[in-house]
Amino acid sequence: MLWSNIIQPRLISLACTSKPICKQRSKVIPFAKGEVLEIGFGSGHNLPYYNQNEIKSLIGLEPSLIMQKLSSERLKDSAINFRFLTASAEEIPLKTNSIDTVVCTYTLCSIPKPELALSEINRVLRKGGQFIFTEHSRSPDIKVNKFQRTIEPIWKIIGDGCHLTRDTRELLAHSGFDIQNTEDMYIPGTPKFIGYHIWGLISK
């Protein structure tokens, strides 16, 4: 279909290039090191922020072949040892304790079963490994949250399953991650209904 195969992937890719979003990426991605797994590689927007000297290899988990194709130009400009993994985050086909860093940016919002995905992330991480993330989340403000709930049904259609009302902090806590070393705020230059973000580096 024209919408799902051409228009929607490009709209999502474009939205992920806004200055506020890019600034969030720059806060966390440079800390990735070793054997790295990126959940929801998309069209490769995180590539410029990786410290190539710290990356042994990068696996891009991306179930969409369309998104994989959109990332081809960015991958041509990268010297990182890279391969795609065409799979879902809820069932990662990698060995337990095999990854040094898992990266997840603006992906938990659209994964059908985020709790299962976080469990899988925890499984593949080595002891001492790190989970690096930045995500938008449910607003703590009643009025903003009400607006999020109102428009979420339409937003999920436009954003390929993106949920506005998922509480990312709560998801992380219930999945056994230590959320003490995380930050959250409304990021400047972004509408409040999509502007409350949480990010951090969590060690296993």
Report residues per predicted region.
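Short alpha-helix
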Residues: D160-G176
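A short glycine-rich, Lys/Arg-flanked "PGG" loop and its adjoining helix->strand segment in the class I
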Residues: E115-K127
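Conserved beta-strand signature within the Rossmann-like core of class I S-adenosyl-L-methionine
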Residues: G128-H136
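Core SAM-dependent methyltransferase catalytic element
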Residues: F177, T182-K204
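A short acidic, Gly/Pro-enriched loop at the edge of an enzyme's catalytic core
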Residues: E90-V102
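Conserved alpha-helix/loop element of class I SAM-dependent methyltransferases that forms part
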Residues: A15-E35, H45-Y49
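A short SAM/SAH-binding and catalytic strip from SAM-dependent methyltransferases
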Residues: D100-K113
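Class I SAM-dependent methyltransferase SAM/SAH-binding core
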Residues: L37-E91
